[in-house]
Each structure stands twice: as structure tokens, then as C-alpha cells.
Amino acid sequence: MAAPLGGMFSGQQPGPPQPPPGLLGQASLLQATPGVPRTSNSTLVDELESSFEACFASLVSQDYVNGTDQEEIRTGVDQCIKKFLDIARQTECFFLQKRLQLSVQKPEQVIKEDVSELRNELQRKDALVQKHLTKLRHWQQVLEDINMQHKKPADIPQGSLAYLEQASANIPAPMKQT
């Protein structure tokens, strides 16, 4: 169905990769986790991949298409999904453990990553603020245009004496002589 994950990335050698330096002797994705039954050459990644494929296989299985009981189909799919979720949790736990080990061994690396994430978040939020300011300016201009349209008819007096009324309003009042 799908190609194995081992050959998906360029430059990756087939076969099990070596654990990172400093982590020798510790459980890795290539070694079985204590307390979890595994086949001799199986890894968490392999099991995650096979359980993912099993989820899809159970959904498109010819047995189910040929009219198997709906409850039986549901049970089979539920079992496949539960297995996939269980292995996904184990994989997540593995990476969380590695993250914890990294934070203990190289705390400055974790701080650098946090600072980088905060900078990226600030840039994203600044861009969002600029986007909203642009929209705000646009709508302010729209409102100003609407207000100007409403004021224009009121500024121009109507009727036969309108011109005289407007002209006389602009003439300054005579000054009183004392």
C-alpha cells in the first residue's frame, strides 16, 4: 500500500539508524520499550505505520464491502483505531522523554528554541495587527465618504433665494462706529 517510512527521506540509509551520541544505552525508537510486547525487529515507528495502514485497510476491506454486519465492521474499525492511538501515545511519550533529556543535558538549547518560538509569534501577531489596522483605515475612509455624501445636500441650500442667502451669510457684518 504505502512505502515504508525508512526510505522516504533522501540520504537516509536503510536499516536501523544509530542512537544519537550521549543517548547510548537508552531506549530509542529502534529498541523495544520495557513492558510493551514487540516483535524482535519491530520499532515504534514501524508499528505506528502498520497500525495506520491497518486503519485504512479495515475501512476499504473487501470483506466489509460484501455485506458484513455493521456492528462487526464498527468493532473491527474501533479496534484498529484504538491500536493506532495507543501506539501514537507511546510514540509521543518517547519524544517527550527525549525532549526532557535534552532539556536536562542542554538547557541553553531549549531556551534558544523558546526564544525563537516567541520571536515567530511576535512577528505573526505584528502582521495580524498590521492587517487589522489596514482594514480599520479602509472602513474609516468608507465612513468618512458616507458622511461627506450626507453633508453635501445639506450644505447646498434649496429654493429661489438660496443663492442670495448663501452670499449674504458670507458678507461681514458692518462695524459699529463709536
UniProtKB/Swiss-Prot annotation:
It is found in: Nucleus; Cytoplasm; Membrane. Residues 109-145 form a coiled coil. The keyword Metal-binding does not apply. GO terms for molecular function: actin binding. One of its GO terms (cellular component) is membrane. Residues 1-25 are annotated as: Disordered. InterPro entries: Mediator_Med28. It comes from the Eukaryota. Keywords: Actin-binding, Activator, Coiled coil, Cytoplasm, Membrane, Nucleus, Transcription, Transcription regulation. Component of the Mediator complex, a coactivator involved in the regulated transcription of nearly all RNA polymerase II-dependent genes. Mediator functions as a bridge to convey information from gene-specific regulatory proteins to the basal RNA polymerase II transcription machinery. Mediator is recruited to promoters by direct interactions with regulatory proteins and serves as a scaffold for the assembly of a functional preinitiation complex with RNA polymerase II and the general transcription factors. Belongs to the Mediator complex subunit 28 family. Component of the Mediator complex, which is composed of MED1, MED4, MED6, MED7, MED8, MED9, MED10, MED11, MED12, MED13, MED13L, MED14, MED15, MED16, MED17, MED18, MED19, MED20, MED21, MED22, MED23, MED24, MED25, MED26, MED27, MED29, MED30, MED31, CCNC, CDK8 and CDC2L6/CDK11. The MED12, MED13, CCNC and CDK8 subunits form a distinct module termed the CDK8 module. Mediator containing the CDK8 module is less active than Mediator lacking this module in supporting transcriptional activation. This is Mediator of RNA polymerase II transcription subunit 28. The lineage of its organism: Eukaryota, Metazoa, Chordata, Craniata, Vertebrata. The gene is MED28.
